[in-house]
A protein has these predicted regions:
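Core alpha/beta nucleotide-donor-binding catalytic domains of modification enzymes
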Residues: 1-122
């Protein structure tokens, strides 16, 4: 059985998505999120991608952002991108960079879900 067939069975068995339901994929540019995007797309789910640029890793993060943009363009997947001044937010809120990045990401994802009328972030 193919990997995608296993994923389809998992989705159906647990009633995770309806046929044809749009999914917002949190796309970092890493192997896991790219695989998730490709599998959901191959299974016929309309996907949109959301990429967060936290400006914490300089050139590496810029390369990730560029890769995500090129991938989405090639696959004709709508891409939503947010740029965050994570260091400033962490300083103002007196939290760690990780906590600030998580809060920024989750807040933005909730906003995108409402605006795009999508139920899930994958």
């Amino acid at each position: 059985m193919k990997f995608t067939d296993n994923i389809r069975q998992l989705i159906v068995r647990h009633h995770l998505l309806h046929d044809g339901e749009r999914v917002l994929v949190a796309l970092s540019g890493g192997a896991d999120s790219v695989a998730l995007l490709l599998v959901l797309r191959d299974l016929g789910y309309p996907v949109e991608a959301a990429h967060c640029h936290f400006h914490l890793r300089d050139e590496e993060a810029n390369r990730d952002a560029s890769f995500v943009e090129q991938l989405c363009k090639r696959l004709d997947v709508p891409l939503h991108r947010a740029d965050f001044n994570t260091k400033a937010v962490a300083k103002v809120q007196k939290v760690s960079l990780e906590m600030a990045a998580r809060d920024l990401r989750y807040t933005w994802f909730r906003k995108l879900l409402r605006e795009r009328n999508i139920r899930f972030v994958a």
